[in-house]
Amino acid sequence: MKKLWGGRFQKTPEKWVDEFGASISFDQNLVAEDITGSLAHAAMLKKCGILTAEEELKIREGLNTLLQKAEEGALEFSVDYEDIHLNIEKMLIDEIGPLGGKLHTGRSRNDQVATDMHLYLKNHVGHIIELIEAFQSALIEKAEANVETILPGYTHLQRAQPISFAHHLLAYFWMLERDKERFQDSMKRINKSPLGCGALAGTTFPIDRDYSAELLGFDAIYENSLDGVSDRDFILEFLSNSSMLMMHLSRFSEEIILWCSQEFKFIELDDTYATGSSMMPQKKNPDMAELIRGKTGRVYGDMMGLFTIMKGLPLAYNKDLQEDKEGMFDTVKTVEGSLQIFTGMIQTMTVNKDVMKQATKQDFSNATELADYLAKKGMPFREAHEVVGKLVYTCIERGIYLSDMPFGEFQQASTLFEEDIYTVLDPYYAVEKRMSAGGTGFKQVEQALEKAKACVAAGVC
């Protein structure tokens, strides 16, 4: 089959060469963006007098017909035409005749594909931001219902200090807020148009790049044609931001997995977000959380794959850049799916408040309160730390907790202890008295919730 670029060649590629070099199996994901970019390019060519009004109308009608067919899933792509651009061009020529070949005036597939990917990420990053905000809203809703739900806070996966469950949930809210800000900031780089950069050096046709950029909703154009067609830093930035987001989701997933285990029993996942075992009838597995944790690795791989592709490429376009798309598509699908799943998982999970509360009474997470108690009475904190450490050791030796220790033994350790010490040992007291900004005190958590809600309402903090 004759290639659209085949004039210089005396032989056609072998079938397996065509198959190896073709990208239509995956870049057909760009069909809507490719047609959208072509519509803007045709309108610009008419404005600049390169196409007549009649020619532009026929091209526009043909492209809109193809776009409608694409939305209906009625387009049939062929490996014979390599990629999405040549497939659409061939379909347009079949639809309106040789005039379809005039559309490519003043552009190359190099700037065309870069434009497609800018449009693709522009749409999907906007959607990801919306999904992050939906997840944040779910966290706020769950946190509002659990301000006074207390559980052990952990360091080194060892019980450390009692905290509000709402405080724990809001920690992820703020991680997600920074993730959202990174995606929002990346739009400055995504929202630029490479259309009209040509193969690498621009074009001799009197085109208006600013006009086509305006039609496509871009804020600006690439100032250098070499840069516009050859760099993929905007994709790398997206992959990096996605990796950061997935890292946060993976950390949260790990906690979900722990919390719903029989060893913790802090939460129970809804049946709609769990699976069973083909052999063990009692099992209820947190597969969705495990998958999100696992899929984080593939997103990291997508990012490192493109970094590795880019590191040795001279200017300008190289065929290596065909490999920039599959990782991008994969990451978009993974991130969007993970956010949707996690939002539903949080909304529907059951919080076992009594189990969480009981866990704060069966440990020594209130030991810091004792040390602070002595320090507030004038004992140097290091000395107070030593005193309380010995009390903890005594309790461990006797198989009791600090709240079980007789008052007389507290006074033997230090005469600064008074009978109010048992109030101090109450986990609710420990949480309530954390009054510093950003702390787990109930009032501070209420204030944090109000700020979080304002951030979601405004779309930015």
Swiss-Prot record:
Pathway linked to the protein: Amino-acid biosynthesis; L-arginine biosynthesis; L-arginine from L-ornithine and carbamoyl phosphate: step 3/3
Pfam family, any one: Lyase_1
Keywords assigned by UniProt, alphabetized: Amino-acid biosynthesis, Arginine biosynthesis, Cytoplasm, Lyase
InterPro entries with a match to the protein in the record: Arg_succ_lyase_C, Argininosuccinate_lyase, Fumarase/histidase_N, Fumarate_lyase_CS, Fumarate_lyase_fam, Fumarate_lyase_N, L-Aspartase-like
Keyword Lyase: yes
Gene Ontology molecular function: argininosuccinate lyase activity
GO biological process: arginine biosynthetic process via ornithine; L-arginine biosynthetic process
Protein name: Argininosuccinate lyase
Organism: Bacillus subtilis (strain 168)
Gene field: argH
